[in-house]
């Protein structure tokens, strides 16, 4: 069986979305859980998983004082965060434990992940003057669920292309469009000219910078 996967992080809608599709009907299944090295708790019920946590109030190299913990957490201080996860599917069965969501016997599914923190600027205490990260994350998730995968992807691509399409580069020479990149790299390492590979690297660098 083949599973088709698409991932995107939308800047306009502040949402991380994963689209999964099984070539074989009813053969898609997975479990979603939240893991982090930060201090946090996780709950799950009714196809909704939420993690709430806090960043450390202090982190320093462990060689400063070997007897002291280099990373210090305090639930009443530091930047809070919330992560929400929900699965959307037209088939299969969704179940949950107290800290995970599972999908079985599905053909297609979309996983929506929204995250927010209480950070409210460099000059404000994120614990006492912070934003309501729980409300923000829930608002983002609700909006994304209403938009759906197709619309989110459309808005995401349009937003990205606003920057990417500003520049075009075309170098003279044989582009050899059917030659795979790994073969191009081998030839280039031997000193062969490949203007298409140079163009590809230029655009790849822009892709990473914009992202």
Spell out what each predicted region is.
Residues 1-211:
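Aromatic-residue-lined binding/catalytic grooves and analogous aromatic/hydrophobic interfacial grooves
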